[in-house]
């Protein structure tokens, strides 16, 4: 069984400014803006590939969203979610239930599964564990996470991968 760090999501006041800063520092580019985020989230995003992983820059588009409240509690921009890709979702789901970790959001289909775990139960960050058909492929279609030719935006001149995430509560 394996679990791979796929994506780090940031919550920020201004997604465009932070995406531009990431480009200036790391040479990475926005590959995708998800126009299909659930309205209940009240967020906009920018996805920037880092090799075969992503940095997702999220910012609130309206008042009183979970992301906006977290941004206010933090007192500024910061980490929001750690998103991992699993080779098998069922054992992770069983372990989460066994530990009594609250699941904030979940989706199970024949081609993709995800569960977002409550930050109070995971040390200060949303932890999302995903599985999809073709999970062993490091450069999959990611049809559930990103649409379009995102691979065309991979820039490895300054950074090639995300190797860790340090979580603060």
Where are the regions a protein language model picked out?
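Core segments of cupin and vicinal oxygen chelate
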Residues: 2, 6-53, 92-117, 157, ...
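A gly/proline- and charged-residue-enriched helix-loop-helix capping module
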Residues: 77-100
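Short loop segments at secondary-structure junctions
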Residues: 52-53, 62, 87, 120-121
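Vicinal oxygen chelate
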Residues: 56, 93-159
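A short alpha-helix capping/helix-coil boundary motif
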Residues: 24, 70-73, 154-157
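N-terminal beta-strand motif that seeds the catalytic metal site of vicinal oxygen chelate
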Residues: 1-19, 77-84, 134-169
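Short loop/beta submotifs within extracellular cysteine-rich repeat domains
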Residues: 30, 65-66, 137
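A broadly used, surface-exposed interaction patch
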Residues: 55-84
